UniProtKB/Swiss-Prot annotation:
Keyword list, A-Z: FAD, Flavoprotein, Oxidoreductase
Similarity field: Belongs to the acyl-CoA dehydrogenase family.
UniProt GO BP: fatty acid beta-oxidation using acyl-CoA dehydrogenase
Protein name per the record: Probable acyl-CoA dehydrogenase YngJ
Length: 380
C-alpha cells in the first residue's frame, strides 16, 4: 500500500494550485455576486491542458489519470466553487461519456475539442419529472430513417448555455418486458429546434451556468447515437459514478478553503486579550474540520484509484460523494461560527462557501440516493 502521489500527480496538483491561486481565486467573489460564467478562465484552463487531464493525448487530452483529475478539481474548487462545479461537469459529464462509449469518429469529432479545451460539453439527464428517478425520463427520440427526432425538456443542466455539444438521454423504444429503453445522443447546441435558456436564480455556485433545454423536433444523425442504444441507462450510471468522484473532490476543495480561512482568522482575531485560536472551543472545531477533510480526501483518492485500475468503484464513489458533501456543509457552517458575526458577511467569503457546498449534497445524486446506492451494493 502506497499513500504517496506520483511525481506526475504532484506536478499536476502544484500546477493547478498555482494557477487557481492567481487566475481563479481573485475572481471568485465577482463570479458569485454577478452570476457571470467565467469563460475567460476556462479558455486559460484549456490552454493549460486542464480540460483534458484524464483523456489520452490522441484526443487532445493530457494523458493523466483520475487521481490527477480529482486533485485538479479539488484545487479549482478551493479557489472558487462555481468554477469548480463547471470544470467537474465539463470533464466528467460533458466529455467522459464520449471517451468511454463513443466511436472513433465520435471521439475525433466531438471529444477532441472538449479535451483540448477549445469547447465545453454538457450532459442533459435531469428533467422536470425525472430527478432522482432518472429512469423516469420522458424525453423521446424517434428513429426516422438515418436520423433521430428528439422531443422533450431538460432542466438544471450545467454548462449548457456555453456548450458546443449536449449529450441527451432519451427514450428510444421499449424492451421485451415493456420497459423504456433509454439511449444517449450527441446533440450539437446549434441544432435547429434546440432552445437553451438560463432562468434560474441559485442559492450558490452562482457563476456556474445552469440551464433549461427545450427540444422540439430536434433532428440528429443516427450516427450521433452514443454507445449501445440498449444500454444508455447503464452508461449514464457509469458516467454518474465517475462524476461523483469529481463532486466529492470539489466538496473537499470547498471545505479546505473554509478551513484555511478559519485557521487564518482564528490566529488573527483576538478576544479576552488573546487569539481565539488559543481557546479549546475553537481548537476542537478546527481539529474536527481538518480530520473530516483528510478522511474525505482519502475516500476520493481511493475511488479514483479503483477507477484508474478498472476495478468496480460504484460503492466507493458513493461513499466519497456522500461523506465529502455532507462534511463540506458541516465544515463551512463551522467556519462561519468560528468567524462569528464576520462570517455572516459576504466580504469574508465563508458564507459563499456554505452556499456553494450545499449543492454537493444534491447534484449528481442526493445524499439519500447515495445511501441507496451503497445499501444496494452491500446487499447484492
Amino acid at each position: 500500500m502506497n499513500f504517496e502521489l506520483t511525481k506526475e500527480q504532484q506536478m499536476v496538483r502544484e500546477m493547478v494550485k498555482d494557477f487557481a491561486k492567481k487566475e481563479i481565486a481573485p475572481h471568485a467573489e465577482h463570479v458569485d455576486q454577478t452570476g457571470e460564467f467565467p469563460m475567460q478562465t476556462f479558455k486559460k484552463m484549456g490552454e493549460l491542458g486542464l480540460m483534458g487531464i484524464p483523456f489520452p493525448e490522441e484526443y487532445g487530452g493530457s494523458g493523466g489519470d483520475t487521481i490527477s483529475y480529482a486533485l485538479a478539481v479539488e484545487e479549482v474548487g478551493k479557489a472558487c466553487g462555481s468554477t469548480g462545479l463547471s470544470y467537474a461537469a465539463a470533464v466528467s459529464l460533458g466529455a467522459s461519456p464520449l471517451y468511454y462509449f463513443g466511436t472513433e469518429e465520435q471521439k475525433q469529432t466531438h471529444l477532441t475539442p472538449l479535451a483540448s479545451g477549445t469547447a465545453l460539453g454538457s450532459f442533459g439527464l435531469t428533467e422536470p419529472n425525472a430527478g432522482s428517478d432518472a429512469g423516469g425520463t420522458q424525453t423521446k427520440a424517434i428513429s426516422n430513417g438515418d436520423e433521430y427526432v428528439i422531443n422533450g425538456e431538460k432542466c438544471w443542466i450545467t454548462n449548457a448555455s456555453y456548450a458546443r455539444t449536449v449529450i441527451v438521454t432519451a427514450v428510444t423504444g421499449k424492451n421485451k418486458d415493456g420497459k423504456n429503453i433509454i439511449s444517449a445522443l450527441i446533440v450539437p447546441t446549434d441544432t435547429p429546434g434546440l432552445t437553451i435558456t438560463s432562468p434560474y436564480d441559485k442559492m450558490g455556485v452562482r457563476g456556474s451556468n445552469t440551464a433549461e433545454i427545450l427540444l422540439e423536433d430536434v433532428r440528429v444523425p443516427a450516427a450521433n447515437l452514443l454507445g449501445d442504444p440498449t444500454k444508455g441507462f447503464k452508461q449514464f450510471l457509469y458516467t454518474l459514478d465517475g462524476g461523483r468522484i469529481s463532486i466529492a473532490a470539489l466538496a473537499v476543495g470547498i471545505a479546505q478553503a473554509a478551513l484555511d480561512a478559519s485557521l487564518a482568522y482564528a490566529k488573527e482575531r483576538k478576544q479576552f486579550g488573546q487569539p481565539i485560536s488559543s481557546f479549546q472551543a475553537i481548537q476542537f472545531k478546527l481539529a474536527d474540520m481538518a480530520m473530516e477533510i483528510d478522511l474525505a480526501r482519502q475516500m476520493v483518492l481511493k475511488a479514483a484509484w479503483l477507477k484508474d485500475h478498472n476495478r468496480p468503484f460504484t460503492k466507493e464513489a458513493a461513499y466519497a460523494k456522500l461523506f465529502a458533501s455532507e462534511m463540506a456543509t458541516r465544515a463551512c457552517n463551522q467556519a462561519i461560527q468560528i468567524h462569528g458575526g464576520s462570517g455572516y458577511m459576504k466580504e469574508y467569503g465563508v458564507e459563499r462557501m456554505l452556499r456553494d457546498a450545499k449543492l454537493m449534497e444534491i447534484g449528481e445524486g442526493t445524499s439519500e440516493i447515495q445511501r441507496l446506492v451503497i445499501a444496494r451494493q452491500l446487499l447484492k
